[in-house]
């Protein structure tokens, strides 16, 4: 793809990943003898248009300093926050928006993102001149549930209704926005105590548009223990395809 711009990516990595039930934060679990965080960050830095990665880490992180990433010249470390949105904002404050008018944000636990999908996202956002996210359309029938509390028989979640899936998408990362617009949108959302689950939700609250860019289903987020084997499979498959 043709672009004279270079890009910076923020990777919020301050979480502990309790659902993984591991002895260390999930981003430091290893696949093929390399941490998930290392797979993710090096995948990003190997893209020809990505110059730097900002990693937002927990203040009590004891693992990064011992990792292969600690002394990389193109990796910037910042302190993470209590929530993902706070970590992203801390990362944004370290970005020179004159040098990097656009910023991407990518989950630490998505090591399988492809260069092809990053290319698609960058190309579409630059062409339209507003931000967007990688996403996959929902394929399964979607149900809205409601919790029924029953002290005698136990609580149960039952189906309330079927949700039309035609316009529903799974939000993935990277998510790409103009640096100043995303910073302002997040700051305003936090000031108004709005719930922000990803960068796109902050942009939505600011009444700004976001593109949905269809991406590969291989771009999974490692959340549960059985995701590790699937991520390893995809990483090995991708490595074989490039050889």
Swiss-Prot record:
It comes from the Bacteria. The record marks 19, 26 as: Transition state stabilizer. The record marks 165, 221 as: Positions MEP for the nucleophilic attack. InterPro entries: IspD (IPR001228), IspD/TarI (IPR034683), IspD/TarI_cytidylyltransf_bact (IPR050088), ISPD_synthase_CS (IPR018294), Nucleotide-diphossugar_trans (IPR029044). Keywords: Isoprene biosynthesis, Nucleotidyltransferase, Transferase. Pathway: Isoprenoid biosynthesis; isopentenyl diphosphate biosynthesis via DXP pathway; isopentenyl diphosphate from 1-deoxy-D-xylulose 5-phosphate: step 2/6. Coiled coil: none annotated. It catalyses: 2-C-methyl-D-erythritol 4-phosphate + CTP + H(+) = 4-CDP-2-C-methyl-D-erythritol + diphosphate. It holds the Pfam family IspD. Its EC number is 2.7.7.60. GO terms for molecular function: 2-C-methyl-D-erythritol 4-phosphate cytidylyltransferase activity. One of its GO terms (biological process) is isopentenyl diphosphate biosynthetic process, methylerythritol 4-phosphate pathway. CDD domains: CDP-ME_synthetase. Belongs to the IspD/TarI cytidylyltransferase family. IspD subfamily. Catalyzes the formation of 4-diphosphocytidyl-2-C-methyl-D-erythritol from CTP and 2-C-methyl-D-erythritol 4-phosphate (MEP). This is 2-C-methyl-D-erythritol 4-phosphate cytidylyltransferase. The gene is ispD.
């Amino acid at each position: 793809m043709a672009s004279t711009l270079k890009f910076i990516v923020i990777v919020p990595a301050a979480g502990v990943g309790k659902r993984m039930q591991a002895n260390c934060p999930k981003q430091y679990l290893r696949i093929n003898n390399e941490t998930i965080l290392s797979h993710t960050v090096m995948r990003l830095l190997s893209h020809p248009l990505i110059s730097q990665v900002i990693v937002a880490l927990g203040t009590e992180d004891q693992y990064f300093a011992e990792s292969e990433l600690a002394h990389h010249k193109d990796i910037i470390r910042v302190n993470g926050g209590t929530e993902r949105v706070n970590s992203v904002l801390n990362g944004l404050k370290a970005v020179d928006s004159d040098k990097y008018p656009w910023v991407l944000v990518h989950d630490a636990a998505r090591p399988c993102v492809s260069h092809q999908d990053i290319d698609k996202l960058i190309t579409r956002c630059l062409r339209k001149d507003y931000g967007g996210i990688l996403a996959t359309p929902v394929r399964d029938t979607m149900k809205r549930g409601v919790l029924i509390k029953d002290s005698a028989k136990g609580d149960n979640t039952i189906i309330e209704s079927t949700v039309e899936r035609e316009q529903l998408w799974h939000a993935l990362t990277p998510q790409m926005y103009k640096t100043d617009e995303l910073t302002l949108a997040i700051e305003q959302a936090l000031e108004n105590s709005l719930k922000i689950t990803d960068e796109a939700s902050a942009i939505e609250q600011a009444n700004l548009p976001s593109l949905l860019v269809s991406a590969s289903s291989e771009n999974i987020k490692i959340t549960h223990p059985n995701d590790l084997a699937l991520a390893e499979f995809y990483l090995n498959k991708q490595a074989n395809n490039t050889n």
